Amino acid sequence: MRLLDRGADPNVASSLNGATPLYAAVNSEWQPRTRYPQPQEREGQRFGYLDLMEALLAAGADPDERMTLHPWYMEYTGCGNAQCGLIDMKGATAFLRAAYATDVDAMRLLRRWGADPFLATEAPARRNRRTTQERIRESQVEALDNVEEFEELSDSAQATAVVTIWGDLPDSVKIGLPEDQIRTTPSEFRQIVLEHALRQDSVNAERPDPSGLPPVPQGGPAVFALHAASGVGYGEGFAGNAHRHAENGWLPSVRFLVEEVGMDVNIRDHNGYTAIHHAAARGDNELILYLVEQGGDVTAISRRGQTTADMANGPVSRVSPIPETVALLESLGSANSNNCLTCQ
């Protein structure tokens, strides 16, 4: 506040990722639990983050300034994707960051100062849109393809490596490759299992997009505020372990975006998910029912072929299924693919 009083530029942005003081004010209040320590001295300050945001806006801060890169201090590593399910903030505005925190007060403040609530994050390159499971599988196939590393493994580790890839092959292929024989002599089956896996991956890559949506190019709109406020990432990684948001803020923030801002409840993110998909991944039955009342489509299919019920049924490994939400969505008309990855 003293810097603003002395004429500091409220729009000065980080040369590393484009973060402005306005974005930082929201982010510091709701910084996720990451591997990096987060300064806490601000909690003893006289002015709160909303006071600072209003002062920045009054001094001329651009409410629609966008992030140019995802900030390094909002990452995890070793999860199969860089953020462990946390949203990729490239292209995000302060308004979208507030929506991600389910912070209605901050969203209202920003909108009052002219923020555009319809600006989305930017879609990454297509190769970077894979799920945690897809990335894990890719690394497993690459490991199997490395002959030298494979030969250094113990017999049991070799068997596990081959059987893991074998387990993802079509049943028609597995019939001709008995599991007991693979476990006995994994080195003899390594190459043939690898070839089948690569062939299957090639076939999968040529399949039409199950969502029926046109592709989103790199740099196109990815995640909108409605997705951020409904739980984007909870069904795509382990965001639930790190994400911080306003207490009991899910429904109020979505209601604000739908009823006051006018967002379409069926708007899709770059992966083809709707707000119902994201609410389902968290088991938020109250929000699901609200979205349905507002015209939400429970039959929507994502680009990964997941129904809304699938998102509540262990959509990635180590994310537990939520039977009550699966049952609710089935009763509302969603199909259930019975593909619980946590249960496998």
Tell me the role of every PLM-derived stretch.
Residues 174-205:
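Long, low-complexity, polar/charged, intrinsically disordered or flexibly structured peripheral segments
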Residues 1-9, 54-62, 108-117, 252-264, ...:
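Ankyrin repeat domain, specifically the short helix-to-loop turn at the C-terminus of the second helix
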Residues 298-342:
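Leucine-rich solenoid repeat scaffolds
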Residues 24-49, 75-90, 97-103, 130-146, ...:
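Ankyrin repeat A-helix N-terminal signature
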Residues 14-15, 67, 88, 121, ...:
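Ankyrin repeat boundary/linker residues
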Residues 266, 270-310:
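Ankyrin-repeat and related helical/solenoid repeat scaffolds used for protein-protein interactions
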Residues 17-18, 70, 91, 124, ...:
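Start-of-repeat signature of ankyrin repeats
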